[in-house]
C-alpha cells in the first residue's frame, strides 16, 4: 500500500526515534478502496509529550485522550497514543482512557473491522480483525461483540448505516441484529451528531439506503417526520447539496414537515428553509408562458428555479413531461439573458419615488409596488418611470390613496 510522502515522513521520524507508528482507520480503508482519504490519522505507542518533542509545530487538540496534531506545511495530522477506553457510562464517550504500549489493544476498541487496519511507513499492513476480508466481501462488521460496541457508543448505529450508504456495503447479520436492539440508545446522542450522519447518508452515492432507518426501527428515536421520507435511488442523480436532496427525500410529504424535522435536528437555516421552499415550488403547476416563468423566478430566484427543474427531471414533485421542463428552462434562459425586471428593487420607480408622488407610506404603498411588479412581469417594456407612474396613480386611485400630479405634493387626500 502506498503512503503519501508527508505521512511517510512522520512515520519514519517516529520509528527512527524508537517508537511504533502507523497510519490507521479510515485513511487505510479508503486507500484500499481506491478512494482519496480526507485525512490521515496516525496511532503510536509514543506519549503525547514524546510526540511533541519530535515535531516543531504541534497543537494540543485532544491531549487528555492522547491526541496531538502535527502541522507540516499546509497539512495537519492527528497523532494519537495507543489507548484502552474505560466504561462508557453516558453511552457516547469513555469515562477514562488508559494509554497502552500494545497496538492490538488500541485496534480492538474501534467500531468496525474495516476501520481497524494499520499501515506502516513501508506500506505493510497490520490487519488483526479481518478488515481486508470484510472490504473484499463489502460488509460492515463490528469489532468483537457488536452488543458491546453499540452499548459503548450509540452513534455507531448511524455510522454503520452511513458507511453502508457511502460504500454500498451490506451490514453483517450479527451487527445488524445488535444495531436494531440498541436503537433506543440513540436518545443518548445529540441531535447535531445524528444529523451529521444523516447528512452524510443523504449526500452519499446510495441515499436510498436511508430506508434502513425504518427497517432498523430507528425512526421513533430520532424523529417521527422521517416516516414520510422517500428513500429513492433517484436522489443520487441530484447534485450533492443538502437542501436539494432533503427536498427530494421529503417531496411526498410537505415543506413544513421537512423544515420541522431539520430545525428540530439543529440544522442550519439555509438547509431547512431551502428544502421547504423547494418542496413548495415543485408542488405547483409548471408555468406554460413567459409571465408564469417570470413570476416563478420572481418568487423563488433563478438558483431555486433551476434546482426545481432538477428535482422535476429526477421525478420528484409529480408527473411532468421532459418537453415541459425543456421549455421552462428555455424560457428561464431567455428571461435572464434579457435582463427582465423580476423584483421590486429593480423597478424603475421605487417606494421613495411613490412617496414623493404623494402616495402615503404603509401597507397600501407595498400593495401598489406589488401591482407595478406584476404589470412589469407581464410586460417588461412597462419598466419605465413614465409607465410606472401611470400604473401607480391608477392603483392608488383604486385604493383611495390618490397622489398629486406634482412631485413632492404632501396634500394628497384619501
Give the label of every model feature segment.
Residues 1-414:
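Catalytic cores of the polymerase beta-like nucleotidyltransferase superfamily
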Amino acid at each position: 500500500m502506498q503512503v503519501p510522502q508527508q505521512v511517510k515522513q512522520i512515520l519514519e521520524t517516529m520509528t527512527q526515534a524508537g517508537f511504533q507508528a502507523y497510519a490507521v482507520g479510515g485513511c487505510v480503508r479508503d486507500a484500499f478502496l481506491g478512494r482519496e482519504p480526507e485525512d490521515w490519522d496516525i496511532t503510536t505507542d509514543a506519549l503525547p509529550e514524546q510526540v511533541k518533542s519530535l515535531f516543531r509545530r504541534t497543537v494540543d487538540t485532544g491531549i487528555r485522550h492522547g491526541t496531538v496534531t502535527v502541522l507540516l506545511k499546509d497539512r495537519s495530522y492527528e497523532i494519537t497514543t495507543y489507548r484502552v477506553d474505560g466504561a462508557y457510562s453516558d453511552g457516547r464517550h469513555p469515562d477514562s482512557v488508559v494509554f497502552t504500549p500494545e497496538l492490538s489493544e488500541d485496534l480492538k476498541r474501534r467500531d468496525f473491522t474495516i476501520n481497524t487496519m494499520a499501515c506502516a511507513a513501508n506500506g505493510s499492513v497490520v490487519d488483526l480483525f479481518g478488515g481486508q476480508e470484510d472490504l473484499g466481501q463489502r460488509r460492515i462488521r463490528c469489532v468483537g461483540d457488536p452488543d458491546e460496541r453499540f452499548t459503548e457508543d450509540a452513534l455507531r448505529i448511524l455510522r454503520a448505516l452511513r458507511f453502508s450508504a457511502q460504500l454500498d456495503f451490506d451490514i453483517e447479520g450479527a451487527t445488524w441484529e445488535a444495531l436494531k436492539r440498541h436503537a433506543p440508545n440513540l436518545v443518548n446522542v445529540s441531535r447535531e451528531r445524528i444529523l451529521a450522519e444523516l447528512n452524510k447518508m443523504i449526500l452519499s452515492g446510495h441515499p436510498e439506503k436511508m430506508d434502513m432507518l425504518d427497517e432498523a426501527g430507528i425512526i421513533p428515536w430520532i424523529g417521527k417526520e422521517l416516516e414520510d421520507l422517500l428513500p429513492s435511488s433517484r436522489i443520487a442523480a441530484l447534485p450533492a447539496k443538502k437542501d436539494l436532496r432533503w427536498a427530494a427525500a421529503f417531496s411526498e410529504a410537505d415543506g413544513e414537515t421537512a423544515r420541522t424535522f431539520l430545525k428540530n435536528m439543529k440544522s442550519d437555516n439555509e438547509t431547512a428553509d431551502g428544502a421547504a421552499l423547494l418542496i413548495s415550488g415543485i408542488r405547483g403547476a409548471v408555468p406554460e408562458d413567459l409571465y408564469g416563468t417570470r413570476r416563478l423566478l420572481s418568487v423563488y430566484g433563478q438558483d431555486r428555479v433551476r434546482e426545481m427543474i432538477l428535482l422535476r427531471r429526477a421525478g420528484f414533485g409529480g408527473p411532468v413531461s421532459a418537453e415541459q421542463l425543456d421549455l421552462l428552462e428555455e424560457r428561464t434562459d431567455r428571461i435572464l439573458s434579457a435582463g427582465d425586471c423580476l423584483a421590486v428593487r429593480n423597478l424603475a420607480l421605487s417606494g421613495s419615488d411613490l412617496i414623493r408622488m404623494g402616495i402615503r407610506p404603509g401597507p397600501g404603498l407595498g400593495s401598489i409596488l406589488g401591482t407595478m411588479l406584476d404589470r412589469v412581469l407581464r410586460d417588461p417594456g412597462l419598466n419605465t418611470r413614465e409607465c410606472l407612474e401611470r400604473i401607480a396613480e391608477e392603483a392608488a386611485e383604486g385604493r383611495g390613496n390618490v397622489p398629486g400630479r406634482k412631485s413632492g405634493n404632501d396634500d394628497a387626500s384619501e
